[in-house]
Regions:
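Hydrophobic structural segments
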Residues: 1-373
Length: 373
């Protein structure tokens, strides 16, 4: 039977908590990682309705995108929604887990799921995230190189764009003198040993380096594994906020708005006034994206689809880019299906029931409003 920690491991192999912004509150909020679970709810946020369903159906874990505790709680009473939910979760031993700004940045995360829902192609991040890259270098007997490369790669090393297990290997001579207390792979205590070694180099996103080192140690033959970590000047290009991609075929504005409405099942779209243009390059940001409008303009996008836009956003950028506010909620909902798909990929979660909480019913009728001058 799956445990809470198995779901956490699956989520954090995809969206490590170390990617989250410093102000964010992610990870396990309540619960015991060793508890057995038969089912899990995936939701944008934990509401009273979510908790009621969990209690009525004996669900032991809820994975949400929005943190249940965002601001510090000074009391645990029924005076507000967050503290009421936390009290209930602790009382009923329901684990609450959150993946927020870390999930925003990863491949197939919040914005990329939105882009995929709209059928975009050649999708890349709109703006860089906060993930630094390291060069991981270790030294090994040649006969161990392949298994070490595989172990490091399985932990997240060696990913460059759409290519996995990227590495460079060079051969040379290593030396060492084992002490009397050492147990060397080869050589004798007190004598200088010279052996042929491979130098294996792989890039690693900084949040994954501890896991890469841990998994490499498990297969490395040396008692003391030598390795170097070198900071790189560029950031991990596959990680970032927002997404930008192409429509398969250019569309006129009314056709594109129909696509957005139908794909996201959102009734009302707020759209900036401006010249009617053909849409080809589309930028998106799941949730609140007004801070990334300049990035969408810089990317040369014809349109930016996001949520939480205000009057002054439409006013300021009406001549620069077409803005479409499809609501915070609707632009984030596609991630729920992606989370379910990712959890199903874990062999440790085979047989686990994964229930999506879509929240309030989304209207499918279509209207759009224009905002701007």
């Amino acid at each position: 039977m799956a445990k809470v920690r198995d779901v956490i491991d699956a989520m954090e192999q995809w969206a490590p908590v170390s990617l989250a912004e410093p102000w964010d509150n992610v990870g396990l909020i309540t619960g015991n990682t060793e508890n057995n679970i038969e089912s899990v709810i995936v939701a944008l946020e934990v509401t009273e309705e979510t908790m009621a369903f969990a209690l009525g159906n004996r669900v032991q874990l809820i994975v949400s995108h929005h943190p249940t505790i965002f601001k510090p709680l000074k009391t645990l009473t029924d005076s507000n929604l967050s503290s009421s939910i936390i009290r209930m979760a602790v009382k009923e031993d329901i684990a609450l887990y959150t993946s927020h700004t870390n999930l925003d940045q990863v491949p197939h995360g919040v914005s990329m799921s939105l882009a995929e829902k709209l059928g975009l192609t050649n999708i890349t991040p709109l703006a860089p995230g906060n993930c630094e890259l390291l060069k991981f270098i270790t030294f090994t007997p040649p006969e161990y190189t392949d298994r070490i490369r595989e172990a490091a790669g399985n932990a997240g090393a060696g990913v460059i764009g759409e290519y996995n297990l990227c590495s460079f290997t060079s051969r040379g001579t290593g030396t060492y003198i084992p002490s009397s207390d050492a147990s060397p792979h080869e050589g004798e205590s007190g004598k200088l040993s010279r052996f042929t070694e491979d130098r294996l180099e792989m890039v690693v996103p900084a949040p994954l380096i501890s896991k890469v080192i841990e998994e490499t140690r498990k297969v490395h033959p040396y008692e003391e594994m030598a390795y170097d970590l070198i900071p790189m000047s560029r950031k991990e290009l596959s990680l970032g906020y927002g997404a930008v991609g192409n429509l398969q075929e250019p569309m006129e504005l009314p056709q594109f708005l129909g696509l957005v409405s139908e794909s996201l099942q959102v009734k009302t779209l707020n759209v900036s006034k401006g010249e009617m243009r053909r849409i080809k390059l589309v930028a998106v940001m799941g949730g609140s994206g007004k801070d990334y409008i300049p990035a969408a303009v810089s990317a040369g996008a014809d349109v930016f689809v996001t949520g939480d836009l205000g009057h002054h956003d439409f006013l300021e950028y009406c001549s620069s880019i077409l803005l479409v506010d499809a609501t915070h909620r609707a632009t984030e909902l596609p991630i729920l299906s992606t989370i379910k798909e990712r959890l199903h990929l874990s062999p440790l979660l085979e047989g686990l029931e994964i229930i999506i909480d879509w929240g309030k019913t989304v209207q499918t009728a279509y209207e759009y409003n224009e905002k701007g001058i």
